[in-house]
């Protein structure tokens, strides 16, 4: 595939933290091997307006073109159907221009388009599994199966998951457990299917404690009222879903009761009020909780305040196929991680 053109379709925006931590670093490094990419993503209008220039600067040195369409959240289901229609139409237009050799998607709506492009145009299809997606939606309490429509959608995507595994030219996953689960499925023909494990990786040049911008750190220290003798425990990433917010806040309160100088830094896209409300349930004072959104280059600086980091994940079936990027990023900074068993 060296020297080939690849379409990467993402329902996550490049102007959101996930796109900047899990998509752009991977693809930018692959361009060094002669590949060129077009990223087709759905971006929240507010994030796009605020971060478009930042993302364009990230991509500028590489053979990567970025095409973004607006993400719609409401009304539920219908908004997703509309986004799918626009993504599919745009993917066809881009293929007419670039004549892609391969389409690379993660599960969900993008993989529907990946299968379509393979069937319609004979493009090779790379099925990139970052979690058992339909089950994640249920176990993350996004889809309630008591709702008949959502139950139908769940079963549709479970069938689609099977089709992706069966039809993909290759599948990749991030855990050996996921590969084992896939290869143990008796409802898939031609086992063992072509599956490779590529664990979540980290940019160790960026997440390097020896390369922290000390001027930026001093500015954050002043703005966030972080003192040298504070004991900082950090959470990185979005709250909710599969991450056990209540349990983490309970843990933070237990630490605060034992360590008076403890403060809890949340490097999150969530609002101050959202985090404060979750913390208040467990009696954490406003002065003990720090909330800061960080751009990609700012995250290592914010992490460098940490004595420890914490994240608790719901131990469920779907998460056997996922590997938190944050884990590698935190460890690359030399910060001990407190987490739960699964």
Q: Model segments located where?
A:
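Carbohydrate-associated surface elements
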Residues: 177, 201
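Membrane-proximal helix-turn-helix segments that form the acceptor-binding/catalytic region
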Residues: 85-93, 112, 116-120, 133-134, ...
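Nucleotide-activated donor-binding/catalytic signature segment of Leloir-type glycosyltransferases, i.e.
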Residues: 267-268, 273-305
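A short helix/loop element that forms part of the nucleotide-sugar donor recognition site in Leloir-type
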Residues: 51-58, 208-225
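N-terminal subdomain of nucleotide-sugar transferases
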Residues: 1-67, 98, 250-257
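Nucleotide-sugar-dependent
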Residues: 17, 243, 292-302, 307-331, ...
